């Protein structure tokens, strides 16, 4: 009988060497034997559990293929599919959103929950830039619907992201927004036959520049939809990622009123008074209160975390995580993975996992760490709690003791109230993923810390306060936190 190594077999079966060794150690590969530290496997042996694996793959479409199993931080759908990287199939979201019939939709989810990747996926599916790119979707859920084949690559799509917009002044932030808008214009300019436009339309097109004023910038996307509708005969789709980033920058740096005025005008022109708009989808972390920027948008469908719409489209379900862990030989860790990274609730789904932490955990081959909690600056959360009242600090103590809080709050976040109302702080902590809803009755929410990863993050923050020389921690009971604090 001929034999081959577990590494060779792993390549043949398109799984990791760790997975093959796991099967060998559990007696799931007939005829396999260990010599020293190396497993030897019969050449002709069948892969164990193939039928069950395929059943799960069809049901949950968790794919870990190619030489590189996990792509950490890649938010480009085309790149993931082209390079056969780790991808949990979320393409049914395309069908769900399209069949909702909503003209303008806002979806809020915590950071690192696949918002950008899902918008990239929508762009690849609908955009004329990806015409005849069925290869990106073959074998995925959406491609099982033959009626959707004719929609692929059919529409002009304006894909704009505010994710990287940073600045300490209104002018600096506006300039970065302008750069993003210019890039979208240039992308279309490279494929449009400008001779088909009137002289006035070409002049309007040319007015878009990095130094355009706020009024021109606020009308720029509306202008582009008009031009694209005339050119293609299909009303464009607008995809706007991280819509709330400029507003957060405005809050941090004290130009809130100017930014609210601009974003309100931008939204009104682009999404309300725009007869050339086909569909629009916006994503963000927070749901800014309606009085700030959404007062004129009566037609927007807001899908917040408690909404039952698109419950599994962002983040990983428990089954998706289980299958993913099994494919890389880490299934034995599933209970601890649940303790660390589970706990996010969207609608009625209470078993949603943080995808960033899961992919980092797999990439690190089973090392537990606060991956998600370390991906952004927690300065705002830390500052607000540090400056908060004694009651707020006591509430944090209760949460860290594993208790639940009964609070009244609004999922719409009013930044103007953050330093004055504790309910606004709870709204922020919930929107950003640090708290989860255990129960909801009208405006009363039963809240608790999301998971162990979040608990460790908060204990680290508070421990740093104790090491500081000021009195910001004065209302905390030092002993309780230092005794239970988890080492960084």
Q: What is the predicted function of each stretch?
A:
Residues 1-19:
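Polyanion-binding surface elements
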Residues 55-62:
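Short, charged recognition helix plus adjacent turn
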Residues 21, 25-26:
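Residue-level detection of the helix-turn-helix DNA-binding "recognition helix"
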Residues 28-55:
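Short helix-start
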């Amino acid at each position: 009988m001929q034999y081959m190594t577990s590494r060779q077999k792993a390549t043949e079966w398109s799984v990791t060497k760790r997975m093959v060794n796991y099967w060998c150690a559990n007696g799931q590969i007939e005829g396999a034997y260990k010599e020293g530290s190396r497993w030897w496997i019969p050449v002709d042996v069948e892969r164990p559990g193939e039928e069950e694996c395929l059943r799960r793959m069809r049901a949950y479409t968790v794919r870990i293929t190619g030489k590189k199993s996990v792509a950490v931080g890649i938010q480009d759908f085309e790149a993931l599919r082209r390079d056969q990287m780790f991808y949990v199939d979320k393409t049914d979201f395309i069908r769900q959103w399209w069949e909702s019939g909503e003209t303008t939709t806002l979806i809020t989810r915590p950071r690192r929950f696949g918002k950008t990747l899902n918008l990239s996926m929508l762009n690849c599916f609908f955009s004329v830039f990806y015409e005849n790119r069925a290869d990106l979707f073959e074998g995925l859920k959406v491609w099982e619907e033959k009626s959707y084949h004719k929609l692929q690559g059919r529409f002009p799509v304006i894909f704009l992201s505010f994710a990287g917009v940073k600045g300490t002044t209104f002018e600096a932030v506006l300039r970065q927004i302008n750069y993003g808008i210019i890039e979208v214009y240039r992308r279309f300019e490279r494929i449009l036959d400008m001779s088909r436009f009137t002289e006035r339309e070409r002049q309007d097109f040319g007015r878009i520049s990095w130094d355009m004023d706020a009024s021109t910038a606020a009308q720029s996307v509306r202008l582009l939809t008009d031009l694209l509708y005339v050119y293609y005969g299909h009303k464009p789709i607008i995809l706007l990622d991280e819509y709330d980033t400029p507003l957060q920058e405005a809050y941090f740096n004290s130009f809130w009123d100017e930014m609210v005025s601009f974003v309100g005008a931008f939204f009104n022109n682009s999404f309300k008074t725009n007869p050339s708009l086909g569909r629009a989808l916006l994503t963000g972390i927070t749901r800014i209160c309606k009085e700030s920027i959404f007062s004129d948008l009566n037609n927007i469908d807001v899908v917040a975390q408690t909404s039952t719409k698109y419950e599994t489209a962002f983040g990983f379900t428990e089954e998706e995580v289980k299958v993913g862990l099994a494919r890389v030989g880490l299934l034995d860790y599933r209970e601890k993975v649940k303790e660390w990274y589970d706990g996010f609730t969207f609608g009625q789904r209470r078993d949603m996992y943080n995808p960033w932490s899961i992919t980092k955990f797999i990439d690190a081959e089973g090392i537990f760490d606060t991956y998600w909690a370390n991906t952004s600056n927690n300065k705002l959360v830390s500052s607000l709690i540090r400056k908060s009242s004694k009651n707020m600090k006591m509430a944090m103590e209760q949460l860290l003791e594993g208790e639940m809080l009964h609070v009244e709050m609004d999922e719409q976040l009013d930044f103007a109230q953050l330093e004055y109302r504790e309910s606004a702080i709870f709204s922020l902590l919930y929107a950003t993923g640090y708290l989860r809803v255990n129960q909801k009755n009208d405006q009363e929410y039963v809240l608790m810390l999301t998971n162990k990863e979040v608990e460790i993050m908060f204990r680290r923050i508070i421990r740093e306060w104790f090491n500081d020389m000021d009195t910001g921690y004065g209302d905390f009971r030092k002993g309780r936190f230092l005794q239970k604090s988890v080492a960084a």
